Regions:
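Charge-rich alpha-helical segments
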Residues: 1-98
Length: 98
């Protein structure tokens, strides 16, 4: 079984700067500057999610992309969320998205 982590443990993980964490979910919003850039980031997120078999909720608007992570099977944050958040943030940086 997957073990939950606290919001503090999530925030201490590498690469998750800019993410907000609560008891059951972590989220961030990226400013993408264009819809096409947002779609490109979603494609990167999709590949990372498939690789990790861990799938975030994403909400793309014209120039923003909001990503929410939670381990639904236990209704809490886990190390899987922190790891994927760090990978998503790295993908955003690679695309020049903040």
């Amino acid at each position: 079984m997957v073990e939950p982590i606290t919001a503090e443990e999530f925030r201490a993980a590498p690469g998750v700067e800019g993410w907000e964490a609560g008891a059951t979910e972590a989220s961030t919003t990226f400013r993408t500057a264009s819809f096409a850039t947002g779609v490109a980031l979603i494609n990167r997120i999709a590949a990372l999610a498939e690789e990790a078999n861990h799938h975030p909720d994403v909400d793309l608007r014209y120039a923003t992309l909001t990503v929410r992570l939670s381990t639904h099977e236990i209704g809490a944050l886990t190390a899987r969320d922190a790891d994927l958040a760090g990978r998503i943030s790295a993908a955003a940086r690679d695309l020049g998205v903040d």
